[in-house]
Design a protein with these regions (language model features):
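N-terminal phosphate/diphosphate-binding loop that engages ATP/GTP or pyrophosphate donors
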Residues: 52-59, 73-154, 158-197
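Tryptophan (W) side chains
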Residues: 3, 17-20
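Catalytic core of IPPT-family isopentenyl/dimethylallyl transferases
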Residues: 10, 20-84, 248-451
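Long, charge-dense, solvent-exposed interaction surfaces that engage phosphate-rich ligands
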Residues: 158-293, 302, 306-314
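ATP-dependent small-molecule kinase phosphotransfer cores
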Residues: 100, 107-146, 187-239, 306-307, ...
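Residue-level signal for inorganic ion chemistry
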Residues: 91, 119, 156, 224, ...
Length: 451
C-alpha cells in the first residue's frame, strides 16, 4: 500500500509550480479595444496546451549504499568527480571528529578532490540520530542543488537513508512528566545492570521489538517506553510514509513492492538509488581483512579507542562509543589497563575475532534491511569498477536507462542462498597469522596502557 506524503520535504524556489491562468469559454470577452488587447496578450502568454499541466522535472539525487566493506565510498568519489557532484555522507560514525580509521573516513587527499559534507561535524561526546541526519542532509542537499551540483548521498546507515528519502515518522513527542516517569521506572534496572529484565518490562508494556535492541542501549529502550506511555502504542505503530519493512517483506509481489515506483512517485526528489553487494563469502573475506588493516598500525583504531578512554568516555555510553570497532577496542583496552598494560597474543586475537564477527553480523543485517528497500537497484560490487561508474553516470544523463545491465546486476536472492557455505565460514587472517605478527601491537599496549 502506498502512503500519501506529507507536505513536500525540500520545497524551495526550484520546487514551486505556478499554475497559468485559464480563460473559461463561458466568460464573455470585453468589447473595448484596450481590454481586448489585454486578453490577447494574456492568451498569447500561455504555454502550448500540451505543456500547461506538465509538472516541473524533479531534481535528481544519487544514493549509493551497500554493506560495510563493499566499496561505496570509492564509487561515490569517482561518480562525483565525473558529474561535478558533492558527496553527502550517510555514515553514523564519520560525523565525529577524531574517529577516522574505525569509520573508514575518506582521506584528506580524497576529500580535496570533491566537496564532502556531514563529516567531522561533531565532538565524540555528542549524540547523533536519524532525525539529526534528516535535518542536516536535507539542508545540505538544497545547498548543493542551489550551486548547480549533483548531490551524491553515500553511506550504509539504513535508517538514515530511509528517513532522508521518505521523511520523519510522526512519532509523538514525550512530555517532561512522561520522560521523568520512564526514567524512574527503569532506573533500578539500569543501576543494577538488569538489562534483560528491563527489556522484558518494555516488551510486556506492548513493544516486543524491544527484544531486538542491542544490549545496554538504554537510550533507545527508554525512548520506546516513553512512546508507549505517551500514546498507548509501540513505535512500530507510527509507520513511515511508505510500505513498512515487514509489509514489504511479507506481502505478495506487486508492482509497488517490486520496483518501488509507487513510493518513488510520491517523493520530492528523483532518487536514483544503488546498492552495492557481492557474494556473501567474498564480502566476509573483505570485511575480515579490513578489520585487520584497521589494527595493523598502532596509530589506527586502537589509538583512537585509547583516546576515547582518555577523555573519559566508556564503551556503549553514546553514539560514538557504541560504534562497531570502537566499542570492542575500548573494551579490550580497558581490560589491558586493568592488567597493568599487559595482554597475551591470544587475548589480542580473541579481540580481533570478536571485532570481525560483529562487523560481519552488521553486514548481514544491512543486506537484510536493504533487500526490502525496493527503491534500490542492486549492483554486483565484484564486477569491474569502470562499467559500474559508467552505468551510474549514464543513468544520471538519461533517466529512461535505469535498468541495471545484466552483466552488473546482483540478484537480491543471491545474498540469501548458499547458507550451507556460510554455516561453515571461518575467518582466515592474512595479517595477524600468529603470535609474532601482533608483537608490535602488544609492545604499544605495554607502553601506553599502564594507567
Amino acid at each position: 500500500m502506498c502512503w500519501e506524503m506529507r507536505p513536500q520535504l525540500g520545497t524551495t524556489r526550484r520546487a514551486i509550480w505556478r499554475s497559468w491562468p485559464v480563460l473559461c469559454s463561458h466568460h464573455k470577452l470585453p468589447t473595448s479595444p484596450h481590454s481586448a488587447n489585454k486578453v490577447a496578450m494574456a492568451t498569447a502568454s500561455l504555454p502550448p496546451p500540451e505543456k500547461r499541466n506538465k509538472k516541473k522535472k524533479k531534481d535528481t539525487v544519487i544514493v549509493i549504499s551497500g554493506p560495510t566493506g563493499a566499496g561505496k565510498s570509492r564509487l561515490a568519489l569517482e561518480v562525483a568527480r565525473r558529474l561535478s557532484g558533492e558527496i553527502i555522507s550517510a555514515d553514523s560514525v564519520q560525523v565525529y571528529r577524531g574517529l577516522d580509521i574505525g569509520s573508514a573516513k575518506p582521506s584528506a587527499a580524497e576529500m580535496s578532490l570533491v566537496p564532502h559534507h556531514l563529516i567531522d561535524i561533531l565532538d565524540t561526546t555528542e549524540d547523533y540520530s536519524a532525525g539529526s541526519f534528516f535535518r542536516d542532509a536535507r539542508r545540505v542537499t538544497e545547498d548543493v542543488l542551489d550551486r548547480g551540483s549533483v548531490p551524491i548521498v553515500a553511506g550504509g546507515t539504513g535508517l538514515y537513508l530511509r528517513w532522508y528519502m521518505y521523511g520523519k515518522p510522526d512519532v509523538p513527542q514525550s512530555s517532561m512528566d512522561t520522560t521523568s516517569a520512564v526514567y524512574s521506572e527503569l532506573l533500578s534496572f539500569r543501576e543494577s545492570g538488569q538489562w534483560e529484565e528491563a527489556v522484558k518490562l518494555v516488551a510486556r508494556a506492548g513493544d516486543p521489538k524491544a527484544l531486538d535492541l542491542s544490549v545496554n542501549n538504554w537510550n533507545r529502550l527508554s525512548r520506546r517506553l516513553e512512546i508507549i506511555r505517551s500514546s498507548g502504542s509501540p513505535p512500530s505503530a507510527y509507520a513511515l510514509p511508505y510500505n513498512s519493512f515487514h509489509e514489504q517483506h511479507d506481502a505478495e509481489p506487486t508492482e509497488a513492492t517490486t520496483d518501488g515506483k509507487c513510493e518513488a512517485s510520491k517523493l520530492d526528489y528523483d532518487f536514483f538509488c544503488i546498492f552495492l553487494a557481492s557474494p556473501r563469502i567474498e564480502l566476509y573475506r573483505a570485511i575480515d581483512l579490513r578489520c585487520e588493516e584497521m589494527l595493523v598500525d598502532t596509530g589506527g583504531l586502537l589509538s583512537e579507542a585509547s583516546w576515547l578512554l582518555d577523555i573519559g568516555l566508556h564503551p556503549h555510553i553514546n553514539s560514538a562509543t557504541r560504534a562497531i570497532g570502537y566499542k570492542q577496542a575500548m573494551e579490550y583496552l580497558l581490560y589491558c589497563r586493568q592488567n597493568g598494560g599487559e595482554s597475551t597474543p591470544q587475548e589480542f586475537l580473541q579481540f580481533l575475532a570478536k571485532f570481525q564477527s560483529t562487523s560481519r553480523n552488521f553486514a548481514k543485517r544491512q543486506l537484510t534491511w536493504f533487500r526490502n528497500e525496493r527503491i534500490y537497484q542492486w549492483v554486483d560490487a565484484s564486477q569491474p569498477f569502470e562499467p559500474v561508474v559508467q552505468f551510474i553516470c549514464n543513468v544520471y544523463h538519461d533517466r529512461d536507462a535505469r535498468a541495471v545491465p545484466e552483466s552488473l546486476e546482483m540478484k537480491r536472492e543471491s545474498c540469501i542462498h548458499k547458507t550451507q557455505d556460510l554455516k561453515t565460514y571461518r575467518s582466515v587472517n592474512r595479517v595477524f597469522c600468529g603470535d609474532d605478527s601482533c608483537s608490535h601491537i602488544l609492545d604499544w599496549i605495554r607502553r601506553t596502557q599502564r594507567k
